Amino acid sequence: MTKNQAGVMTSATAGLNLSDSVYERLLRERIIFLGTQVDDDIANKLCAQILLLSAEDPTRDISLYINSPGGSVTAGMAIYDTMQFAECDIRTVGMGLAASMGQFLLTAGTKGKRYALPHARIMMHQPSAGIGGSAADIAIMAEQFAHTKRELNELQALHTGKSVEQVTADADRDRWFTAQEALEYGFIDHVISHANQANGIGG
C-alpha cells in the first residue's frame, strides 16, 4: 500500500469505528440488524433505514436480522407499522434470541419470508406494565394496558394463523420455542442453516 492510498483510507474511515463500517456495508446490501433491546433510539434508526431502502428500490426485499430480548412496546410498534408501510417485502431472520417484541417483529415479516437459524430461541409473552400513581391514573393505565395486550394478541393471531383465544392463553406466561417449534406454531416459515436456503437473503 502506498502512502497516498493509506491517506485515502484514513480519510474515508475517519470518525467510523469497525462496527459502524460493518453496519453501513450491510445497509448497502439491504440488510438491517436489530441486535439490542428495542427502545426509541433503535426504533427510529430501523424505521429510517426501512424507509430509505424502500424508497431506493421498492421491488427488492429488505432483510431484517433479529437477536433481541425485546423492549418497549411503543417503539416496537413503530418498527412494526413501518414494516407494514414499506412497499417492499421484509424478510426476517431470527438468530440467537428473539423474545417478546423481538419475537413479534420476527413474526411480522412478509409471509413466506420469515426465517430462523437452527439454534435460535423464540419467546412469546404478554406485555408487562409498571402501573403506579393515583387511583385515577392506575385505572387509565390499566385500560391502556388491556388495549395494548388485546391489540398485540390480535396481530399475533393474524400473522400466525392461530386464534386470538389460543394466542391469549399461550402468551399469558413466558412461552419458549425452539426454531422448529416456532415453525410449527406459525411464527416463522422456514428453519435455515445456510444463507442460500433463504433464496437470496439480502435482496
Curated annotation (Swiss-Prot):
Keywords: Cytoplasm, Hydrolase, Protease, Serine protease. GO terms for molecular function: ATP-dependent peptidase activity; ATPase binding; serine-type endopeptidase activity. Its main location: cytoplasm. It is found in: Cytoplasm. It comes from the Bacteria. It is an enzyme of class 3 (hydrolase). Pfam families: CLP_protease. Fourteen ClpP subunits assemble into 2 heptameric rings which stack back to back to give a disk-like structure with a central cavity, resembling the structure of eukaryotic proteasomes. Cleaves peptides in various proteins in a process that requires ATP hydrolysis. Has a chymotrypsin-like activity. Plays a major role in the degradation of misfolded proteins. This is ATP-dependent Clp protease proteolytic subunit 2. It comes from Nocardia farcinica (strain IFM 10152). The gene is clpP2.
